[in-house]
């Protein structure tokens, strides 16, 4: 269809109003039209004032796209004409529609940047009149945003950066002049709407210029923090004025406050602001004065003022950013090193942040500020520890600060009534409590064992179930820090509290899951105690195991998880209660949930593994018979999803029996008759392989008495359903039994050939199978190289298949194939030699763009191995260099972007590099970018720089 105005208007109408299928076609056609050369002409026709807003917006968007993507289509002599048209369009749409005006301003910004921002002031002069002031602000605001988002070549970016650095001083001065009206006297009446709007626009513009990140951060004089303090004070004053008159200001007052605080955050943190501690302290003191007024407003829990909470959220975000950027100055101020008024103000700001963390009410029902501070506590404790650096003690003042924080976290962990929470609120609260758990560990890094003392005190002082549950939640968060081998009394006291709650589930139903979490989390600590303390710990652990078992009917998932952890880490009490645990595991009512049942089976396995064999074997037999019966029943049923639950239960039990190979062997022997039925059903083959894999992992060399049956099951299952789990079983058979069992040869050959036949039709369709196959072959080549003789008849086909897998899009299969070919090059070059030229060609195709660039590292390892290989059967002069040269010889290969100079540089660097994978990866990376036409772009510069940093 021709790109006429009429056709384009019709397509836009279909896109906005048609059916889904028609809209998709219209979108495709309209997108193609944006790239057409005719677009430079039809955009102006579609932008006429008589056209609809949707059509005007499409035209403005097309203009922006053309300037970004098709700038090379504009001859230099047409730049002036395009500039005039852009300015006329921007001025013509000064009164809207707003979305069209904004898009035209962005287009003008892109035009300016495509010319390296030269003559910036001259280009924008027509917008400098009072009536066009808002347009000028809009264009100035989007220029830095467009600069950050645009893809441009390195030279053009450097040119733009220099021009923007030069212009930024004037722009920020202009914004400051606009914001300084906040210093006027507003004691009798509030600022009018026009003034408020001007503050919003000026703050947005200044923030945009300050927020150019990284290497592109503006480095003019106005970007040093001391010189930005005047701007910061103007922004703070604007917020203070608007907050003072909040009841009489327009609805845009909060938006203006948020814009000012966003700009203030940028001014406080960008441009190496942390190099100026004195200015930072002054800034934090000013922020404290502002926050003191806003944050001290009482928070009404019954009727939350969400408009005010939006302002508080913006202010807290700003304060947190300033404190995180200037943490060192803040630490010194709190410790009294900076004793002037500014230092006191910074210390006051920290107290206000603690108060915000302890905001009354429940998150997210009554407030949304307390979740903004968690990153500050991490940064603060990290700076305190770095400054101490093991050479000096932490200042005692931090004990008080982090004690306050810990108490606040305990309070904020309290959960509201479930009826008050929507599903979304429940998820927010779950994430919030996880953040609280992390912050508790920050407290531990400063307070150490005192954390348990503070938490125990909070539990003792609690007068509601919710408060006690919150203390237990914090106690559970500290479990990873429990001192193994030591017995702090407050820790034991809290664990006793958790035990009492778990032992009386009806009395504390809401606290029960948290109490059970405590029992399980401290299981490893209980198991670490010895001597007199160990005796007390063993008794306590036994009580914990009994309590977890008794709580199963009331909180099955939490109790089962706690029981599993306790049985795994506290062997003596688990062994003593093994019979009870096995009985509970067989209880159908408790075991209905599959996840819970797996936890119970794992707990039973750990308890049996800790017991004497004569006592454990009969108990295990009852479990094994039950599982075998379930597997048999599922194998005889017609349900397609059958068997998975029983098989996963077998896996859980077998994994827990790993410390007792004799019991693992008993279990496998009992399961073998049922397992023999599974290869007859394709959907049960993979569950069978999972059981065999975990059985071999638990038994290791002790699998030999049953290896014949395992091998037969593996071959039978793999013939019916080749899958990755089956190849994992083959790998374990070879590793554990290859030297003692002659049948390993047949099992390996049968399964490898079956996998190769499956992949030969379409390797990309089964990436997981390809990954597993070449992971198996890599393990055989490296650990059991003689086993390659077993598959020698198909080795050539496997090599050719691996060459195809090198360029599949799924990274797992490609990476495994490259790894095996590299190992083969080091150990069996004669097997790889016939395919080497084709492999070199495939590698070039892949580097050139036939596969994702994420696979370049695996290809680099392969090229390095090929270059190091000793090609004993190669003709004179043959090797990686000749094969790569032959592959690169055709013009335009692998892409038209790869010039002869690029190819020669790549070839030379690859051939000479035989030792450093890092240097070879840089060469491959650079050639890959060249093949994609990206070699001189900003993206290429950042990519190569990132590789250098990682190296």
Predicted features and spans:
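Helix-loop junctions that connect tandem helical modules in alpha-solenoid scaffolds
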Residues: 11-18, 42-51, 86-97, 123-136, ...
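Extended alpha-helical scaffolding segments
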Residues: 82, 100, 316-363, 367-393, ...
């Amino acid at each position: 269809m021709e790109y006429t105005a009429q056709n384009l208007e019709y397509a836009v109408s279909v896109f906005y109003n048609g059916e889904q299928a028609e809209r998709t076609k219209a979108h495709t056609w309209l997108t193609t039209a944006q790239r057409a050369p005719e677009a430079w002409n039809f955009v102006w026709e579609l932008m006429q004032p008589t056209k609809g807003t949707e059509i005007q917006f499409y035209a403005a968007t097309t203009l922006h796209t053309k300037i970004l993507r098709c700038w090379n289509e504009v001859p230099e002599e047409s730049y002036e004409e395009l500039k005039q048209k852009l300015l006329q369009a921007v001025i013509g749409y000064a009164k809207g529609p707003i979305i069209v005006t904004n898009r035209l301003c962005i287009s003008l910004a892109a035009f300016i940047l495509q010319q390296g921002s030269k003559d910036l002031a001259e280009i924008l002069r027509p917008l400098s009149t009072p009536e066009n002031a808002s347009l000028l602000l809009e264009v100035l605001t989007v220029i830095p945003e467009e600069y950050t988002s645009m893809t441009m070549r390195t030279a053009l970016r450097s040119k733009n950066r220099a021009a923007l650095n030069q212009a930024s001083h004037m722009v920020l001065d202009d914004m400051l002049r606009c914001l300084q009206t906040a210093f006027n006297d507003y004691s009798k009446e509030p600022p009018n709407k026009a003034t408020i709007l001007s503050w919003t626009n000026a703050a947005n513009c200044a923030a945009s210029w300050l927020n150019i990140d990284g290497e592109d951060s503006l480095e003019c004089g106005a970007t040093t923090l001391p010189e930005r303090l005047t701007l910061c004070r103007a922004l703070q004053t604007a917020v203070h004025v608007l907050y003072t008159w909040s009841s009489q200001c327009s609805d845009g007052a909060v938006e203006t406050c948020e814009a000012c605080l966003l700009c203030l955050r940028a001014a406080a943190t960008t441009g190496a602001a942390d190099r100026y501690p004195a200015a930072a302290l002054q800034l934090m003191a000013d922020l404290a004065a502002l926050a003191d007024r806003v944050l001290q407003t009482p928070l009404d829990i019954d009727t939350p003022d969400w408009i005010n909470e939006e302002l508080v959220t913006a202010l807290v975000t700003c304060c947190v950013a300033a404190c995180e950027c200037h943490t060192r100055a803040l630490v010194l101020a709190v410790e009294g090193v900076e004793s002037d008024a500014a230092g006191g103000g910074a210390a006051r700001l920290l107290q206000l942040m603690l108060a915000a963390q302890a905001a009354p009410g429940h998150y997210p029902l009554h407030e949304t500020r307390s979740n903004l501070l968690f990153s500050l506590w991490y940064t603060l404790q990290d700076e305190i520890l770095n400054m101490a650096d093991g050479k000096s003690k932490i200042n005692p003042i931090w004990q008080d600060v982090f004690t306050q924080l810990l108490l606040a976290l305990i309070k904020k962990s309290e959960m509201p009534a479930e009826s008050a929470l929507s599903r979304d609120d429940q998820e927010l609260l779950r994430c919030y409590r996880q953040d609280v758990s992390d912050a508790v560990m920050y407290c531990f890094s400063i307070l150490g064992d005192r954390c348990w003392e503070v938490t125990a005190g909070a539990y003792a002082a609690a007068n509601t179930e919710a408060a006690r549950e919150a203390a237990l939640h914090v106690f559970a968060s500290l479990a990873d820090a429990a001192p193994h081998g030591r017995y702090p009394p407050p820790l034991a006291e809290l664990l006793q509290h958790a035990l009492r709650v778990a032992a009386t589930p009806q009395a504390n139903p809401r606290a029960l899951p948290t109490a059970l979490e405590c029992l399980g989390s401290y299981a490893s600590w209980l198991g670490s105690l010895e001597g007199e303390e160990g005796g007390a710990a063993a008794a306590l652990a036994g009580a914990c195991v009994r309590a977890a078992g008794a709580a199963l009917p009331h909180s099955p998932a939490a109790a089962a998880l706690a029981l599993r952890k306790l049985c795994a880490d506290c062997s003596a009490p688990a062994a003593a209660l093994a019979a009870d645990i096995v009985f509970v595991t067989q209880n159908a009512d408790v075991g209905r949930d599959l996840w819970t049942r797996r936890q119970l089976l794992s707990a039973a396995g750990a308890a049996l593994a800790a017991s004497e064999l004569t006592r454990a074997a009969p108990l295990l037999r009852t479990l094994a018979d039950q599982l075998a019966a379930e597997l048999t029943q599922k194998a005889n049923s017609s349900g397609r999803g059958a068997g998975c639950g029983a098989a996963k239960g077998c896996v859980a039990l077998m994994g827990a029996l790993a410390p007792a190979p004799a019991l693992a062997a008993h279990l496998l022997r009992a399961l073998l008759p049922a397992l023999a039925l599974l290869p007859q059903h394709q959907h049960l083959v993979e569950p069978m392989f999972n059981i065999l894999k975990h059985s071999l992992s638990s038994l290791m060399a002790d699998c030999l008495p049953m290896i014949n049956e395992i091998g037969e099951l593996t071959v039978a299952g793999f013939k019916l359903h080749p899958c990755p789990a089956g190849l994992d079983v083959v790998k374990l058979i070879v590793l554990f039994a290859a030297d003692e069992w002659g049948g390993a040869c047949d099992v390996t050959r049968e399964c490898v050939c079956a996998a190769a036949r499956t992949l030969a039709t379409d390797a990309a369709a089964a990436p997981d199978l390809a990954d597993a196959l070449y992971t198996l072959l890599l393990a055989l080549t490296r650990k059991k190289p003689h086993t390659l003789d077993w598959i020698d008849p198909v080795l050539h086909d496997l090599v050719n298949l691996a060459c195809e897998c090198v360029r599949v899009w799924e990274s797992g299969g490609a990476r495994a194939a490259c790894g095996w070919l590299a190992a083969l090059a080091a150990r069996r070059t004669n097997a790889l030699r016939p395919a080497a030229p084709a492999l070199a060609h495939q590698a070039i195709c892949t580097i050139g763009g036939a596969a994702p660039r994420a696979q370049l590292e695996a290809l680099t390892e392969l090229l390095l191995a090929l270059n190091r290989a000793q090609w004993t059967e190669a003709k004179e002069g043959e090797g990686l260099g000749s094969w790569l040269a032959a592959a690169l010889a055709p013009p335009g290969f692998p892409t038209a972007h790869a010039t002869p100079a690029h190819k020669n540089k790549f070839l030379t660097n690859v051939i000479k590099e035989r030792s450093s994978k890092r240097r070879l990866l840089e060469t491959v990376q650079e050639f890959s970018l060249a093949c994609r036409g990206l070699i001189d772009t900003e993206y290429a510069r950042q990519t190569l720089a990132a590789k250098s940093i990682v190296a």
